Swiss-Prot record:
Entry cofactors: heme
Protein name from the UniProt record: Cytochrome P450 6k1
Subcellular compartments: Endoplasmic reticulum membrane; Microsome membrane
Pfam families: p450
Length: 524
């Protein structure tokens, strides 16, 4: 046997020392990438770059990007996802170029799922390139205002069930609004996306709610897995990372096809998302009945081979709707109720607006009524500023790109991020940013605000396709809750809130118990 020193132990020590030196030199060179480009960056750590706090689950990925945002007064900041260089864009003018003006250079997202995750990898959130574009165009008629108006009765029915739930429980105990709003959001998504009445508010063991919990149950491993899905495609492949577990996939698949088969056998139509998916399955397109301008479909059918509306490709669409919809709607609702409980003057002003609409509509507000309340929109907008459900936007640079007004060239394949917590809580754009103030979104203040500093739904061709639905679900619930109840903090309400260091979406470490009292100013 050939040895280096004639001593096995000494050989092992030499090899170990060589590996340590090689690793040190690799990281020493690798971690000078941004310095060599003249880009400011927080000091990275060997192996982990700037993501050790996320690996240790002391800071969520969104909070890490917030920390990086605050690390330097610069239009952009370099950082390292383990050993991979990435860049955080801070300047609103550059953000505009990334999201809109130069979209073709940044049209792909960085988030990814393993190919074996047949539901998680075949939707608008994770698809890139021509398949994403084709799917986006085909789905765009789903979320027009006309379609939302047709789905409104389904959402309103869930809001009335939420109102009934509060009536039954308001006088006995404080209500945990995180769980209550999650049940409401689950009922809304299950009825609109899957055509199933899950009855989560009535049944504590409802299947849809149980699977929703599992998706967002952030164990130590799940936290690391989701972090990889957003930030490290290499780790996703190594871990075989999934948005949906095998159990969840089988559940959603069964619900979907059972519903499809029942409707087609019995010729049932319900004006929901499932009806539109049946159109896609049978015709390859969705009728744009209300005539609203959507993504252009001309010349897109030549790419139909890139994405077929069959099998799990179909199931993945309501699966994403379920995942992206229920948690974001629930957190927006719970944060809004929390802030209104702490500021009764804001709550009373909103209740007064709701009471006026209830009076003119004889207690039956329409879709137009809900979307026609200016102060309600200001309140929800301020919640989305302070608590953006997904606290980051992610892109990948698809070609060497010279940043306008600078000498920096972002190299191809570089991950590009926008920190919404940083942007939305930057005192330069929002004075006293920790203060919850809906007046920031008055028409006058909106006109004065710098563009591209408010991005809860993203912007440009990659913006959230379901934003109208999200607004409808949240606003309808608030109208029916505050029409009859005052919401107040109780002795167990956490003040201030502590944000979770594990969750990929913005969430609190604990529950949010609040007290609901029948309003003396109710109008029905």
């Amino acid at each position: 046997m050939v040895t280096i020193t004639g001593c096995a132990l000494c050989d092992a020590l030499v090899i170990l020392a060589t590996l340590i030196v090689a690793a040190y030199l690799y990281y020493a060179v690798r971690f000078t990438y941004w310095k060599r480009k003249g880009v400011v960056n927080p000091k990275p750590l060997p192996v982990f770059g700037n993501f050790l706090p996320s690996v240790l689950q002391k800071r969520s990925p969104g909070q890490i990007l917030w920390d990086i945002y605050k690390a330097a007064e610069a239009p952009f900041v370099g950082f390292y996802i383990f050993a991979r260089p990435a860049i955080l864009i801070k300047d609103p003018n550059i953000i505009k170029h990334v999201l809109v003006k130069d979209f073709n250079a940044f049209s792909d997202r960085h988030a990814s799922a393993a190919e074996s995750d047949t539901l998680g990898s075949q939707n608008l959130f994770t698809l890139n390139g021509a398949p994403w574009k084709y799917l986006r165009v085909k789905l765009s008629p789903t979320f027009t205002s006309g379609r939302m108006k047709k789905m409104y009765p389904l959402v309103e029915s869930c809001a009335k069930q939420l109102q009934d739930y509060l009536k039954e429980n308001c006088n006995t105990k404080a209500i945990e609004v995180k769980e209550t709003t999650a049940k409401y959001a689950t009922d809304v998504i299950s009825t609109c996306a899957f055509g199933i009445e899950s009855n989560s508010l009535k049944d504590p063991n409802a299947e849809f709610r149980e699977f929703g919990r599992k998706i967002f149950e952030f164990t130590r491993y799940r936290t690391f897995e989701v972090m990889a899905l957003f930030f490290s495609p290499g780790l996703v492949k190594f871990l075989n990372g999934n948005f949906f577990t095998k159990e969840t996939t089988e559940f959603l698949r069964k619900v979907f096809w059972d519903t499809i088969n029942f409707r087609e056998s019995n010729k049932i139509s319900r004006d929901d998302f499932m009806d539109l998916l049946i159109q896609l399955k049978n015709k390859g397109t969705i009728d744009n009945e209300d005539g609203e301008v959507t993504e252009k479909v001309d010349k897109i059918d030549k790419d139909s081979h890139l994405f077929e509306f069959t099998g799990d490709n179909l199931v993945s669409q309501p699966a994403l709707f379920f995942t992206a919809g229920f948690e974001t709607n629930a957190t927006t609702l719970s944060f809004t109720l929390y802030e209104l409980s702490l500021q009764p003057d804001l709550q009373n002003r909103l209740r007064s607006e709701i009471a006026g609409v209830m009076k003119t509509s004889n207690g039956k507000p329409t879709y137009e009524d809900v979307f026609g309340m200016p102060y309600l929109h200001m309140v929800v907008s301020e919640t989305l500023r302070k608590y953006p459900p997904l606290p980051l936007l992610d892109r990948v640079c698809l070609q060497d790109y010279k940043v306008p007004g600078t000498d920096l060239i972002i190299e191809r394949d570089t991950p590009v991020f926008i920190a919404l917590l940083g942007l939305h809580r930057d005192p330069q754009y929002y004075p006293n940013p920790e203060r919850y103030d809906p007046e920031r979104f008055s028409e006058e203040n909106k006109r004065q605000r710098k563009a591209y500093t408010y991005l809860p739904f993203g912007e440009g061709p990659h913006n959230c396709i379901g934003l109208r639905f999200g607004y409808m679900a949240v606003k309808t619930a608030l109208v029916h809750m505050l029409a009859e109840f005052e919401v107040k903090p109780c002795k167990d309400t956490p003040i201030p809130l502590e944000l979770s260091t594990r969750s990929s979406v913005l969430a609190t470490t604990s529950g949010i118990p609040l007290t609901f009292v029948k309003s003396t100013a109710q109008v029905s």
